[in-house]
A protein has these predicted regions:
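Extended, intrinsically disordered, low-complexity segments
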Residues: 230-314
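Alpha/beta enzyme core
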Residues: 2-226, 277-313
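Intrinsic low-complexity, intrinsically disordered segments enriched in polar/basic residues
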Residues: 1-2, 250
Length: 314
């Protein structure tokens, strides 16, 4: 479990904190290993990875709470979490926020969608503000803060989105986000009108050019930036290996491939530092064991990656 809250990470940072979106303990591990200081749970990617269905309102609080508790317990960096529309009215939002904070989330993103099957439809302002008040009440005294999100389209509804964010801050939200931001011009417009911490959502780019840079947006008050790559990268790798292994009718491609860690073979176990577990167990007084998989030796944790102590991941 992270020794620092997301609030603490943001307060100590002198630049925009970049947080990739994750969906399970393996994706969280990969994000932590390369050095990112925080991460965001993607509701849409959880829907695909956990339940095998598209992002279309299928996920429920139990799904999100369960994976949040697993990721938070086994990771050394703080996790923010997308709680969709809070899974119902104000009372449902209150309950969801309470449970998610208890599960280990360090920030909760609550959106103003009026229909989770069509997230472009916005709730009436006052209905959304009721949910914001409920979430804030639930998080009182918790080491978890609210990210108030609007789905307003900057092309046609930017002023509406700005007003919703401004009011959310007035109600007590510590961070806001206009989730469809896609350029520096609109980000600047928001920054000039909405006080407080701001999240730049799902940064993208094309032809080698990012839509914004952290250097551009940090002076505007955007101290948190999210992005998606983990699920696509995982699927890309599995399909690459799968096509080759299917053609060979074996696992030779995987066993022979030199990956980013330099570890050979078919197992990802070394990336989860099994020998660290054995060291911790031995520190309690027992004999130091060697970790093997059905008698096969397992390599040590790869060099050049962040190795979080096992004590912080159990």
């Amino acid at each position: 479990m992270s020794k620092k809250s997301l609030r603490q990470v943001l307060l100590e940072a002198d630049r925009c904190v970049v947080a990739p979106c994750v969906y399970d303990c393996a994706s969280a591990r990969a994000v932590e290993m390369v050095g990112f200081p925080a991460m965001m749970l993607s509701g849409g990617e959880v829907s695909v990875a956990m339940n095998g269905v598209i992002d279309y309102g299928f996920s429920n609080l139990t799904d999100i709470e369960w994976i949040t508790s697993r990721i938070s317990q086994t990771s050394g960096i703080p996790l923010a979490a997308d709680i969709e529309d809070g899974f119902g009215g104000p009372l449902a939002v209150y309950r969801a926020a309470k449970r998610m904070a208890a599960a280990g989330a360090k920030a909760l993103q609550l959106e103003d969608a009026g229909d989770m099957e069509d997230s472009t439809t916005l709730l009436p302002r006052e209905k959304y503000y009721e949910k914001v008040r409920a979430a804030l009440a639930a998080l009182e005294g918790a080491d978890c803060f609210l990210i108030a999100r609007t789905n307003a389209d900057p092309a046609t509804e930017l002023d509406e989105g700005v007003e919703r964010c401004r009011m959310a801050v007035e109600l007590g939200a510590q961070m806001t986000t206009v989730v469809k931001l896609g350029n520096l011009r609109d980000a600047t417009y928001v920054a000039e009108r909405v006080p407080g911490w701001k999240m730049y959502p799902d940064v993208g780019g094309s032809n080698g050019v990012p839509e914004v840079s952290v250097e551009d947006i940090y002076p505007l008050g955007f101290n948190f930036l999210t992005m998606h790559y983990t699920l696509k990268a995982a699927m890309d790798g599995m399909l690459e290996h799968g096509k080759a292994n299917f053609a060979q009718q074996g696992s030779l491609y995987t066993c022979d491939k030199v990956d980013a860690t330099g570890i050979m073979g078919m197992s990802a176990s070394p990336l989860f530092d099994p020998h660290g577990y054995m060291e911790l167990e031995a520190s309690f007084g027992g004999k130091r064991k060697e970790y093997t998989i059905v008698g096969h030796e397992v390599e040590g944790f790869p060099e050049g990656f962040v190795r979080t102590p096992i004590r912080d991941r159990l």
